[in-house]
Amino acid sequence: MANTMEAGRSAATGDARTKAALETAGGPRAPKLAGAPHEGRSIVAVDGLVKRYGEVLALDHFNLRIEPGEVFGLLGPNGSGKTTAINCMLQLLTFDKGTIELFGEPMRPSRYDLKRRIGVVPQNVAVFEELTVRENIDYFCALYVSDRARRRDLVDEAVAFAGLEGYERFRPRKLSGGLLRRLNIACGIAHKPELVFFDEPTVAVDPQSRNAILEGIRQMNRAGSTVVYTSHYMEEVEEICTRLMIMDRGRALATGTNAELKAMVDAGEKIQVDVPEFPDAALERLRALPHVRRALYRDGVLELACANGTHNLGDVLAVLQAFGAAFGRVWAEPPTLNDVFLEITGTELRD
């Protein structure tokens, strides 16, 4: 029983570990992946997934398809169901209804053959304090690879990929935060998973570490891993994901590439105007214009989403002048994922 509990804990920790190796931007090349090639079917297929926590509906008939080689983003606010969906896919949670297939095969708790092909990077970092860096990596790798000689080679590769040479005999408490993240990643990728789940991997890290994490994910993807990436950081998802899904309240609201999602909601250019003071009545007048889909005012900036971009700018400026609102710089910006999220859900997803 103790071994079973340890294995369960290790699977979860493997998630966070992958984060760390990602911090080693510009490090050694990601090792090539092992495992049978995927045979033309979706690597992840979820249909009609329902998960309840008492009266709370965490997943509401959730559907998902992820193809081999993608970096697929699950985008949504905290509580949108991203982590719940991943935990159901990994069989860490039971669910009330629906089906899950990974690698074209039904996923069940007993499918250890499928679990060996998966890596998990949870939001919270977790390693064994009593083990050294190398022992931690070897422990988690041993859950998937029994041959000691093969495992020794895999651990060597993971140490190099994570930039942990010289730290192999250190215990986690002696490592800096960045090195600890590298250890987490090394443990998660040592067995060379074909499918890797990253759950909010850049929460509470500095910008430099965040960039390194993203570069590490790119390296893994170039080496052949399919990546499932959850985040509520818009810029991150826009930068790294080849395709993404917008989630809210346990539902999949829209799926596509960045460009497809913007086209889906006709998220044209945003007009922005520096306005030191702007009365609520003027804002309501702008919202009443037929071509204005959205008007927000905050921090001295008026932000407008217009159906025709800047073509109706004259009408906007006329409203400002009618209310005696002094304005300065006027400029247009391309739409962002936050604009798409706002159009689809009616709320903003702020970093």
PLM regions: where:
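ABC transporter nucleotide-binding domain
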Residues: 214-307
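Conserved ABC transporter NBD signature motif
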Residues: 98-106, 114
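Catalytic Walker B motif of ABC-type/P-loop ATPase nucleotide-binding domains
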Residues: 196-200
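Conserved ABC ATPase "signature" region
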Residues: 138, 142, 149-167
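Conserved catalytic motifs of ABC-family nucleotide-binding domains
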Residues: 192
